Each structure stands twice: as structure tokens, then as C-alpha cells.
């Protein structure tokens, strides 16, 4: 059984990449990845506009949570292969505050057979709503274990520090209560958005920043405390246990700086599990070769059999999926086939043809002695309301009047040109020469204004630079700048040594603000 996690950076995004742009559905992607249970993060869509082709995948049950306020943001989903397992329970959110789909009560108020339970304690309703308003967590109960899929908030400095603290605290407490009070096995997958150790990043300045920025130190300490063998640890980092010393095991890269070709990334996507599931683990790894996002998939494989016991016997195979499943969502229920759709269309067309037209209604009212009254608000009449013959005559009259107007304008223009020529004939040749010269100079000036400048060349390779914009909040937000266009990686020792043979494929140190470059180019 393969449990796979992938931050897709937009549910439609993978289909922009090869080979997925040759595929028609997520079913084909899942088959290619050999995945049975898939957790996707960063859906970046709203519940009301989520396309059916992504909500319903043949052979899979699906479960989604979406942000409640902010649009085109966050979102987590699960796809579960029906012939592998069907969970007995499913919840969205961590705190239990969200309503059960189709019911008038929340998960915390639901009957025992519907809720997974063991919610965080001592959280007021306002904070609970705040934590679960962004569509960041889903829990599925497979009897043998509870599978948690998360998209944790990114560390963006002090801006959302309080939200991150509340989210991390609630998530840890939920996991801890499920393990210690519920005696449950746990698997947690997803984009945790925190690197754990120096081996998990190519940029060692990340480790230096940790000692300088308290919010970074705090978030990394959270995941270190969550993981065993920490004294406070609850879960094992299965991916790292399988590959304890492997370097370059990164799952996320900066696409704007094109760092993936040089594998200059970080490891922030995880497959975590309680120690009692370790005997069932067959493998855990990343799929760095799989394109489709700024993240790559990570997976955890469970053995089909252990000590003569079959995995399938321990997994749930419910007759009906939980209420969170899209199978219970009326918008995605296959109630009509295409034949019935065309029948409905033909009946509508027949009714329209049998109904009197607007012109017939007007004629009838006129013959009865009453004149029709049309308000200004309703003065725009549908073209289809005219009979075909009348509509053709009306369109022809419009076209004739249009061309007649064009002809008049053309004649008027010709008259103006004749006058201009007569005036020029009265001027001497020197005046004409000066006029033409001035026009040419003006034209060249406008060309210089509107023509694109060639980008500056980087000092390390003498190659055209890349143009970027500062997106990080601060005093430089929105400023434009130029940097070396090569992928980020090991920096060349002497960025000005252009005479040396260029054996270094990585980005040099060149940087210039666009405003400075434009000012210098004028000198």
C-alpha cells in the first residue's frame, strides 16, 4: 500500500508539465505514481468552483477541505483507492469546530460513530474557527491507523506568528491525545513547511538564520520536539530513517530562481508515523524526478504482509464512505447521463419554437388597440426575438449604413489631404526638408522610448540577466532588480574572472537594482 503526499501548488498545475500534459485525469497520474492513497496540498481553489474532473476520480473516493474566507489559497485533499480501503471516519480541521457535511452539528458535537475525537482542549470557539478557517488538515480513520494530511502555514516572519503558534500547538495536542488517550497509531503526511536539520537544506545560511531569527528557531524546535528520539517526541521521520545519511534529499525548490536543476532545495515534506507502525514499513522516499510543482511527491510504502498477517485484514472496508466524501456531495453526484441532457435540451428548444415571438406579441397588442410600452431599462431586445427574415433585413441595413458612413469619412479625409498637398506646394523646398528631418528625428526619439532595452550582462558570465520583483514585505517591496540568470548553487569564487574558462554552471553574485541600472545607462 503506497501513501503518497504531494504539494501540487494548484490542483490544475501538474497538467502544465510533461508528461502530465499528455494525461487526461488524475487517475492516470496516480497509476503512474503507483499510489493507493494520495494527499494533495495547496489546491488553490474554492469549494463552490472546484471542477468535477478533480473532485471525482474513477476508482477513488475523495475528501477535501477548503479555506473558508480567503480564495485561491491553501486547501488539502485525499484520494483513496476504493479497492484498497474505505475509511470508517473522516474529519476536516484539527479542532472539531467545523460542521459535519450535511448536518447541523460540528465534529466535536457529532455522535461517536461519526467522529475521530480527542480534540485539543481549552481552545475557545474564536481561536478554533481561526485555526481551521484555512483548509489545512484532514484526518481519515482506517481502523489500523489514523492518517493525517496537513499543509502547515509557511514561516513568513512575524506577520502570522500568532497563527502559526496556534496551529502548531493544536496539531501537536491532537496527535498527542490520539496516541496517549486514544491508543491510536498515527501516520502524518504533507507539507510541514519547516526544515528539521542542517542535512535538510542546501543553503547553509538557513542554519545561521535560525540563530538570528526567533520565529525560525521556534518553528524548527516545534518539529524537533515532535520527532523521536526527542524527549518530547511522538512520531518517527520515516523518510530519514530509511535514508539516514543521504544528502540532497530535498522536496522543494525555488522555481523563480530555477534552483531545481542544481538541486539547491530544502526538505519540508514529510512521511511521519508512530513507532508501532515501523515493522509494517517497506520503504519511504522522495520522487525528485517527478515534475508538476515546486515540490516533488514523497511516499510511504506499507508491506502487504507482516509475520503472516495481511495488511488488508487490518484496514477498514466500509460499505459507505464517511460524510466528508464527495460521494455525498450533490454537486458531484452523477444523477444524469448525456442522453437525458440532450433530451432536456431538445424539449427546451421545442417549447421555445412553440411560444409566440416578441414581434407577434407586439402585433397582437397593436391589433387589439393597445400600444406596447417599453421602459428604458428593458430597451435592449434579444436579436433572437426577431424573425429570421426581419433580422436579416435589420442586419443588412446596419451594414449598409456602416459602409456609407465609412465612405463619407474617406471622402472627407481625401479632401483634407488635397488641401495639405496644396499648402505644401506653396512652401519652398528647404522648409519641406526641415519638416521631414524633424519628423524623422521625432520618430527615432519615440522608437527609443518604446523599444525594449537589452538586459544587463552579469559580471561572472557576461550573459543576459534575469528580471525579478521583490515580493517579500518590507521597504523594498515591489522594487525591480536584475540577477544572474543561471540556476542557484555553489557560487563561483571570483565572480569577475570572466577570462577564465567557465566550468561553473551556477549563478554568480551579480545583482543590481533596476533603477540603478537605468540611471547608470543614461550616463
Swiss-Prot record:
One of its GO terms (cellular component) is nucleus. The record marks 193 as: Transition state stabilizer. Keywords: DNA damage, DNA repair, Hydrolase, Magnesium, Metal-binding, Nucleus, Zinc, Zinc-finger. It catalyses: Exonucleolytic cleavage in the 3'- to 5'-direction to yield nucleoside 5'-phosphates. Zn(2+) binds at residues 458, 461, 484, 508. It comes from the Eukaryota. GO terms for biological process: base-excision repair; DNA repair. The active site is at 151, 191 (proton donor/acceptor). Residues 353-362 have a biased composition (Polar residues). The record marks 295 as: Interaction with DNA substrate. Probably binds two magnesium or manganese ions per subunit. Residues 348-392 are annotated as: Disordered. Gene3D superfamilies: Endonuclease/exonuclease/phosphatase. DNA repair enzyme that cleaves apurinic/apyrimidinic (AP) sites and removes 3'-blocking groups present at single strand breaks of damaged DNA. Provides the majority of the AP-endonuclease (APE) activity. Repairs phleomycin D1-induced DNA damage. Plays a role in oxidative damage repair. Belongs to the DNA repair enzymes AP/ExoA family. PANTHER family: AP ENDONUCLEASE, DNA-(APURINIC OR APYRIMIDINIC SITE) ENDONUCLEASE 2. This is DNA-(apurinic or apyrimidinic site) endonuclease 2. It comes from Schizosaccharomyces pombe (strain 972 / ATCC 24843) (Fission yeast). The gene is apn2.
